[in-house]
């Protein structure tokens, strides 16, 4: 099967500082891949390269065999900063990226995705009336409403409290089961990566290269406390320098 995302010898630096030091990775259609690495290793720069916000010094990122030169509606980014428009209602936020169809059809699509993420009844609410977890649901729904092939997530739950973040992970898995997206998640949370992903990619210190790729074979729902997953967690933490190997 051809790769949905193909990353070939990807390199990027700023002035004299090399940040991404040569990354090769293929992501299959419908696969969920998580990337973890030490703080400051170049994870966010890698995400910008994948999304087309930055161009590499050498190598390339390709989607369906086509090099990424600019941001694309087929690859939507959900970031830690949040991007909900405070002057728009939930429904209007979800309609924002919908270009096809008359207003009634776009509103129906927005309401469908609001219901999918558990926001039925809040379509007319403004962001200031919502909790942090509900705002993240709006972001996820808006990303999925434009029907992207690829969802790129840059530490999307890092600003949430631990209980809300755990709930949002479960919500994300539930929603992704309903639609077949290719997902690439960058996170500092090793348990989150193991809980969600089909594979976990561990990056080196800057300039980032791939140290190891860990396949996660256990089906969902998962418990990270399972011995097999705990063993993977310990191995990842050892590579990140948190535990002794």
Language-model-derived ranges and their functions:
Residues 15, 88, 92-106, 116:
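ABC-type ATPase nucleotide-binding domains, specifically the catalytic core motifs of the NBD
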Residues 36-38:
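The feature captures the beta-strand-to-loop junction immediately N-terminal to the Walker
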Residues 51:
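Helix-to-loop junction immediately C-terminal to a conserved catalytic motif
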Residues 104-122, 174:
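Conserved ABC ATPase "signature" region
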Residues 126-130, 134:
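Conserved ABC ATPase signature
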Residues 145-149:
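A short, proline-enriched helix->beta-strand linker immediately N-terminal to the Walker B motif
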């Amino acid at each position: 099967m051809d790769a949905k995302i193909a990353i070939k010898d990807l390199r990027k630096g700023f002035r004299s500082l090399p940040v991404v030091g040569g990354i090769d990775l293929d992501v299959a259609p419908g696969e969920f891949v998580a990337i973890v690495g030490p703080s400051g290793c170049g994870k966010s720069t890698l995400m910008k390269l994948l999304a087309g916000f930055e161009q590499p010094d050498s190598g390339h990122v390709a989607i369906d065999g086509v090099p990424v030169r600019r941001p694309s509606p087929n690859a939507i980014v959900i970031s830690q900063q949040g991007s909900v428009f405070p002057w728009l209602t939930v429904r209007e936020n979800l309609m924002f990226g919908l270009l096809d169809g008359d207003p009634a059809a776009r509103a129906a699509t927005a309401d469908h995705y609001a219901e999918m993420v558990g926001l039925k009844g809040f379509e007319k609410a403004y962001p200031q009336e919502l909790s942090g977890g509900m705002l993240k649901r709006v972001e996820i729904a808006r990303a999925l409403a434009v029907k992207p092939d690829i969802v790129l997530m840059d530490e999307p739950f890092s600003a949430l409290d631990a209980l809300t973040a755990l709930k949002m992970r479960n919500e994300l898995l539930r929603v992704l089961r309903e639609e077949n997206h290719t997902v690439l998640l960058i996170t500092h949370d090793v348990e989150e990566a193991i809980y969600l992903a089909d594979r976990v990619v561990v990056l080196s210190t800057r300039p980032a290269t791939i140290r190891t790729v860990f396949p996660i074979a256990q089906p969902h729902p998962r418990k990270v406390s399972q011995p097999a997953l705990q063993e993977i967690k310990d191995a990842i933490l050892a590579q990140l320098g948190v535990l002794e190997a």
